[in-house]
Structure formats: C-alpha cells, structure tokens
Amino acid sequence: MAAQCCCRKAPGAEAAPARPPPEPPPALDVASASSAQLFRLRHLQLGLELRPEARELAGCLVLELCALRPAPRALVLDAHPALRLHSVSFRRASAVSESPCTFAFPAPGSGPPLPGFADAPGAESASCPLAFRLDPFTDYGSSLTVTLPPEVQAHQPFQVILRYTSTDAPAIWWLDPELTYGNAKPFVFTQGHSVCNRSFFPCFDTPAVKCTYSAVVKAPLGVQVLMSATQSVYVEEEGLYHFHMEHPVPAYLVALVAGDLKPADIGPRSRVWAEPCLLPTATSKLSGAVEQWLSAAERLYGPYMWGRYDIVFLPPSFPIVAMENPCLTFIISSILESDEFLVIDVIHEVAHSWFGNAVTNATWEEMWLSEGLATYAQRRITTETYGAAFTCLETAFRLDALHRQMRLLGEDSPVSKLQVKLEPGVNPSHLMNLFTYEKGYCFVYYLSQLCGGPQRFDDFLRAYVEKYKFTSVVAQDLLDSFLSFFPELKEQSVDCRAGLEFERWLNATGPPLAEPDLSQGSSLTRPVEALFQLWTAEPLEQAAASASAIDISKWRTFQTALFLDRLLDGSPLPQEVVMSLSKCYSSLLDSMNAEIRIRWLQIVVRNDYYPDLHRVRRFLESQMSRMYTIPLYEDLCTGALKSFALEVFYQTQGRLHPNLRRTIQQILSQGLGPSAEPSTEPSTDLGGAEADTNPDSPALLLGDEAPSSTISLRDVNVSA
C-alpha cells in the first residue's frame, strides 16, 4: 500500500481539500547531514540486486516526498563514500495513483535494477535528471545534495529516483561460505544501527523520520532472502523476493539478510530461520517460548502490532548480540550455547516491539528512551514468566557490570548521562553502553515506584504506546505524559524532589540516583557472595576446601557468571588462589557455555596463569564471534601475553571476518610496545599445557550526583 501525500485530491474534485494541520518537523539530529526538517518522507521503495562474488549491492531507490516549505532548492540525504551514485532523477507523482513503483531487473551484471511506474491517466510519467554532489560529513558518512527543479511546491508529492551501487559498506556484511556454519553458500546481512544504513541506501538517517517501505530483491539461485517487513512473497517465475513494511519505521530498522537459511515454526506467529545445521537446536530452545513471551508482553502493554515475530540466527561474524529489526529479530548464533542469555536477549528484543520500534527516540542523544524502557519491559516480562527471583538475579548481574564500567570511565564521564549532548562528528554507535540500558532502566523503575508499583505503571505505558505508536519522541514527551496520566503526582511536584529531580536523572553524570532493592533475588545472589568470600578468605587451604564442597554445576548461568565477574574484579589474585580455582573449576567450566568460559579465561589471562593458556588457545581457535574474541585479545595485550596473542591470531585469522580481523590487528598493534615486534615464530613456552517479599513495592537505594559535561570525540575512545 503506497502512502498518500496530504495534498492529493479525489478525481473530479472542484477544489483542493482542506489542508490538514502541519506536522511538526523532525527533531534536529546532529548525527544526520540531511534536510529532513524540510520534507515529509511518505514511503521509500528499494530495488536491490545482490552480487556476492563482487561483494556488491546494486540498488534503485525511490523516495516519495512532500516539501514542507515552498520552493525548496535542494534535498540533502545522508550517504556514504561506499555508495557510488550513477544517476538521480525527479518525477512528479500522480495525484491519483496509489500504485507503488515496480522494478524491472536487467540481465545479471548489466547494471542496477531499473524503476518502472504504474502511471495514472493523464499523469506526468517522464522523469528528468537532477544534478547532485557528495560532500564529506563525518568519518561515518557523507552528505548527498540533490538540486530540485523550481516547480516543486509545498505539500505537492514528488519522487526522487536514485540508482547506485554499494561496495565495502559498513552496513553490509558479506561472508564467504567458509565463514558460515554450513560452508556451502555465501551470506550477507545488514546492520543499520545506529547510523550505518546511509551506506546501504541514501536516506534521512535519523530516528526522527519514519516511513513505510517496500522492496524487490534479486539474489543468486538457492539463496533465501529475508527483510524486516510485515509482508513477503517469493515469485518463483521472476526469481524475485517482494517485501512490504506497512508501518512507519526509521531508516536504521530497514534490514536484509540472505543466505542458506531454512525455516521452522515455533509458534502460531513465529518461526526461526537458521542454517540447516543449527535449525534443530534453535527450534528446540525456542519452540513455544516466544509465543509465551509475546502473550505476556501483550497483557502488559497492549496488542503486538507487527504481525509476525520471526527470528533469524546469523553467523558468528554478526557484530552485536541481537538487533530488534521489526518482524525479524537478528541474533547471533553463538548465543544458542547459553539458555539463560538466549532467553534474556530474545525477550529484550520482543520488548523493543513496543519500546524502540513502535515508539522511538527522536535523536541518538536520548537512546535510553528505547533501551531503558525496553530493559524495564523485558524485566516485567521475565517476572511474569519466570518469577521475581530470576529477574532480580539478572538485574544484579547487569548492575554489577554497570558499576564496573563506572569505575573504568570515572563518575564524571559524560557518556554516563542519560540525556547526552553530542558534538558533531561523534558516532552515536560509540555511545552504546550500559548506562543507556541500566541507568535508563533505573530511572524508569523509579518512575514506576512513584506511581505506586508496576501494575499502575503498566497501565501508563500501555497508554503511552497507544498515544505515540509509529512516531518518534523526546524525553519530555514521556515525562509530560507520565505527569498527565498521574495528575496527583504532578500536584506533588515529584519531578522536583530534592536529589531525585527528573532533570538531574537526565543530565547528571555518574551512577543511577536510585537503584531497585533486589532482595527478592537474595536466595540466588547470597550463595554467589558467600562463595566469593570463601575464595578471598584466609587461610587459603581451609577456604578452598570449604569452597570446593559447593556444587556450582547446579547453579543458574547468571549465578556462575556473577561469581566469575567478582573474581575478575578482584584480579590480579594470588597465584595460589588461581591455581586452586583452576584445580577446582577449570574442567567443569570447560563444559559450560561460552559466556561462562570466556569469564574464566579472562581470569586466566589477567592473572598470567600459564598452565591454563591452552584453554585460551582452544577457545580462540573455535570462536569467530566479536563478543568472545575481542575481550580476550584486549586482556592478552594489556598484560604480559602479547606474543601469545600474536601467535594465536596468526593461526586463526583466516577464519575471521575481515572487519573483526582489522579490529584485532588494531588491538595487537596498540598492545605492542616500541621494543616488541610482531613475530610469526611460535612461543613454545606459553601454548602448552531473606528480604521484602512484596514484588510491587521494593525500596529504592539512593546514589550521588556527579557533574555533567558535553560529549566530544575524546570521550568515546573507551571500550564500553
């Protein structure tokens, strides 16, 4: 269904219909070079051809636009040096036609797909070429300025057609068959968050702008194509995939994946897609569960709006854990090893269907509006499904990591604010850190306590989603809606309570001003603290004997991970402690999932415990995932094991994605001192051998304020 411009009139009408009230322009986004505030984007249409052998995507993009002001001289889009623009043209849209663009594909290799139009009688069908230029903007993109013809008038629909090819684009990840599990077919996926999709197609690359989209995709025979769309059809006789997203989404949520993917239904509105060898595991771990989580979310926050909720498992090269692309969550296949991490990650992406996808932060300076609310909703869903104790354990684990990051960055770091102020040139993707999630969660949790508990707050969030669905908001929209929904709180001036002012929550650096009381999870967290205290007690022999009697194999994954994180925080440990830990746990931990193994191996590396380095080597030889390789290489290069890191890298680099390989090379080069030269010679000496039980009213633990400042480029050069 093609979106219509507000100025279209019915055939035969004597006069133009009354113009609707003007829509507010999008929020200003310093991460976008575009002129989004001057135009209304109604719909975008993509014609794409995937060329894996050349690692090239050929595209034709049609933007359906209305100018918001008279006689605009130019249209400015976000683009990228990876885009090669072949032509840009203009076409006046028909006032009566509702037919979207159709795409005719030429013979393979003869050029990008060509647009064709279903013309209405009497409509101007001819397009005219437009002048354009690409200019530098930041290190993550360019600006594309298109000169518009003088006849463009305010509120009159028109189309801009762009033909381009994209190679070596940050948004498009091409994998040779050797980098997949099946080693059979090439694989490609896109990752648009936060500002990468400007290298996928020219766009208004800001979360403030949403539109519907459609796409037609041509791919090599036998390659399955999926997109983040509400409708998809494969026309076998054409060899083309057709997609349509009927709800407005920001550019970063337009996503594509193609490869040797097979489906399996796991519920009435869900299926998993994965490489054939992974499909049985993915199906067994999620069958029935996703519908349970969706139903819980609907009880809390209203109907699921996106039709289907499918999940595609991507190869280990996927640069993040998961991405909430509407209708089609992308998730890294490595997470299948860990049941509990898989559960939490998928539920978090489910929560984004309401918070982030339906209601979106208007700028990247307020990412907490999506991530903080999604984290809160995720924990409400897990509480409904698995109980408060499990939710408190997972929250304790994450808040523990938040405070660890706080110690790393310092309490005055501007990236610890919820409402950040970006200087031009800062890549918003670098600001994805635990403050966005966990400090945002703590503020949302605080709001829920102000109104009397989670049930009343659920009612508010349901109304908030209904009011703002398919739009983008700023923090003030959320807070104004909150105080309007609870007028008694507005009368009490809860937004100005000393030390807990809303403005202070948003703009103060440092830890959260208040944190939830997690005592309902004490039955799960107390054993962790007790075991950690045993291992740090004196005398070691007696402590080790007592500790070894505790069977952690029966623990939840988050308990074991929290225990190992405590040991990591205490590193470097005495060598005799590490030796006893290894004797007690190393074989057991070897049999556990990667989330556990990497933590134990970081303890090994940070304590220079050579007898277990063979486990580090084996782990890095088997892992191709960014989230499991980067932390170990960083630790290896920080300590005394740089030559060991080099040796392992030289032996495994051929199995790594080029982007990951470059990142590790940077770590290795930074980790080498002036006297240390890279060597391919093997290093033979290193590689061998009880509490409040009311879930509705937990107390709040207050924190302190820290000064605030502006985020600049130097502030994001810290590993988050």
From Swiss-Prot:
Cofactor(s) annotated in UniProt: Zn(2+)
Protein's GO biological process: proteolysis
Binding locations of Zn(2+): 348, 352, 371
Superkingdom of this protein's organism: Eukaryota
Binding-site residues for substrate, renumbered to this chain: 321-325
Catalytic residues identified in the record: 349 (proton acceptor)
Stretch list, region Disordered: 671-708
Site (Transition state stabilizer): residue numbering on this chain: 437
Reaction catalysed by this enzyme: Release of N-terminal amino acids, preferentially methionine, from peptides and arylamides
Listed Gene3D superfamilies: 3.30.2010.30, Neutral Protease Domain 2 (1.10.390.10), Peptidase M1, leukotriene A4 hydrolase/aminopeptidase C-terminal domain (1.25.40.320), tricorn interacting facor f3 domain (2.60.40.1730)
InterPro entries: Aminopeptidase_N-like_N, Aminopeptidase_N-like_N_sf, ARM-type_fold, LTA4H_cat, M1_LTA-4_hydro/amino_C_sf, M1_LTA4H, Peptidase_M1, Peptidase_M1_C
Biological role stated in the UniProt entry: Broad specificity aminopeptidase which preferentially hydrolyzes an N-terminal methionine, citrulline or glutamine.
Family affiliation: Belongs to the peptidase M1 family.
Protein name: Aminopeptidase RNPEPL1
